[in-house]
Amino acid sequence: MKRNLYFLFAFLFTLTLTTAAQSLVKTVPAKIPDPDLNALKREAVTEVDKMQTLTQQMVDSIFSFSELGFQEYETSKYITGILEKNGFKIERGVAGMPTAWTASYGSGKPVIGFITDIDCIPRASQKPGVAYHDPIIEGAPGHGEGHNSGMAVNTVAAIALKKLMEKNNLKGTIRLYPGVAEELVATKAFFVRAGLFKDLDVMLGSHVSNEFATNYGQPAVNSGLVSVQYNFHGRSAHAAGAPWSGRSALDAVELMNIGWNFRREHLRLQQRSHYVVVNGGDQPNVVPSEASVWYYFRELDYPHIKELFELGNTMAKAAAAMTDTTVDWRVLGSAWPNHFNKTVAEVQQKNIEAVGMPTWDDNDQALAKALQKEIKSKVEGLKDKVTPLDKPKEPQGGGSDDVGDISWNVPMVYLRYPANIPNLPGHSWENAIAMATPIAHKGSLAGAKVQAMTALDFLLNPENVKQAWEYFNTVQTKEIKYQPLIGEKDVPAIELNKEKMGKFAPELKKLYYDPTKYKNYLEQLGIKYPTVKN
């Protein structure tokens, strides 16, 4: 009897423990394993590859729009339509610019930004795939910088990321921005002032190039600038009958330019300054009562840019005093020198090397070599190797890009993706030739893969974000803090290029790419790829 009671007690005790254990298992959820970063990157590449046709269509469509800075209405409508259709929340007209917008998906931290430019170049109209000068519309704007490809890169990357975030329940936010009027260096300082980047953890920029590369620090061939228009006001009179009654605003413009040109000898070698007269009066027999000149003052750092700007103001006031006119000025745009983040660049470089260069075929190389020969540059075709990480070098000065203002407010890099031909002059019809061809399509697809992979590195690894900000705070901005070059009362010059686009838009619209009828823009234009001189 005792033995039976013992076994009964043991059975009940074991049953109680088992029930308690099962209850405990039910109340404590199993730990969800962390996502496999490498597996997600492979999945991102697969998703991007599925959008090869979308990439080509975006590159070709934006090429066909050919819109100048501040007039990118069709371009912005097209891009935001694609993003909205794919579940992104759009905010239009940001920072006081009708063609500016943001597109967001997700919630919470980290917040990863994507930015790339969308405007084109005056007088750069060119038939794609034709290795000599042959404009689509004579005198019209064209994508002679290749900005038509960047939004394909960032949009395709963002859509791929969204799919992965939904599927794998990944936390964080991705947000896209357009580089409006970059060729005027006229908007990103206003974006900063409007607070568009205040919550960003990392910004991933992209820009067309002939190489696959990234860098950190200040690029060797980069300057900051301030863009200023000086407006002189005089008094009109009959230029022959009573010139003594007039006060020539044009005389003031000319004296300012003469004074500046004499002063150049006594400026630092690193400075670059240039001007165009945007209003020289109406006709010779009327003393000009109004005249304007537009200056770019470029230097290597904020103090020297500010110094040039103040010197320009002094020259303008002196010219006004000499001619008994008055002067005022307006800052049209500005750019801090670029400074890119070491941590973000090192992470991005690994992804560039993982993706590798596109595979160019004989037609791609034939176009590249024929164009290089046509313009008498070095004939070497397209690059076939990834560029090693570009480390800081002594700045020498050069072109300017207003992403510099962003780079001094949030850790940022610029992916240079291989969608164009080496050894071209830039800002010209030559640079438009490859930009709606398989060269641009392949390079943009490769760029989208790197953007998506790099975003995953920061979405899934908080340590990367932490290290990026450590570099930003303890190295980049340790001694230099961002100060805007635009004033509190300055506003975006959204009226610029309106007249030029009004002239060419009706003809351009007739030639917008129609992907429902044509496989690509080359087919629509009836261009054999490549078309080269015999």
Over which residues does each language-model region extend?
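Acidic/His- and Gly-rich active-site-bordering loop/insert found
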Residues: 22-143, 152-172
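Histidine/acidic-residue-rich, glycine-tolerant segments that coordinate divalent metal ions
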Residues: 133-142, 148-149, 165-288, 506-519
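Acidic-glycine-rich active-site phosphate/pyrophosphate-binding loop
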Residues: 119-133, 221-231, 420-428
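Bacterial Sec-dependent N-terminal signal peptides
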Residues: 1-23
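Short Gly/Pro-enriched turn/cap motifs at secondary-structure boundaries
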Residues: 92-93, 182, 218-222, 393-398
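Divalent metal-coordination and catalytic microenvironments
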Residues: 62, 83, 103, 114, ...
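Metal-dependent amide/peptide-bond hydrolase catalytic core
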Residues: 254-534
